Design a protein with these regions (language model features):
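Beta-rich accessory regions
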Residues: 1-117
Length: 117
């Protein structure tokens, strides 16, 4: 699984992970923000993942938007609103068997968009 937008004192973070036994994809936002009036939810849904094959999960975090793509077949989107500027850490975790991970990280440049409204 992934811990996203975590700060060093662990007061803000979001989790995205797969429960193999229950066949559930889980997005845990119960600690995603210290801001007032932000819904802190635990979302989960049935999802069958063939764990006998390599799994590719791509996550794109752009501001408050998190987009996930699983094996180029399925996608999900959520939003998170961390308050602290140092809520930028990313961690990977696994329970159970040994997991092999390959990761690439890209830093996106700010878009220079003109809004003519």
């Amino acid at each position: 699984g992934f811990t996203l937008c975590k700060n060093p004192d662990n007061s803000e973070y979001s989790l995205i992970y797969y429960d193999v036994e229950k066949e559930e994809l889980i997005v845990d936002q119960t600690h995603s923000s210290l801001r007032a009036h932000i819904p802190l939810k635990l979302r989960k849904d049935w999802y069958r993942l063939d764990t006998t094959k390599p799994v590719e999960i791509r996550l794109f975090i752009d501001g408050s938007v998190v987009e996930g793509f699983i094996n180029d077949e399925d996608a999900f989107t959520t939003r998170i609103f961390p308050l602290k500027e140092n809520s930028t850490l990313l961690e990977l975790f696994s329970d159970g068997n040994t997991t092999e991970v390959a990761a690439e990280v890209w830093r996106l440049k700010d878009a220079r968009v003109k809004m003519n409204f």
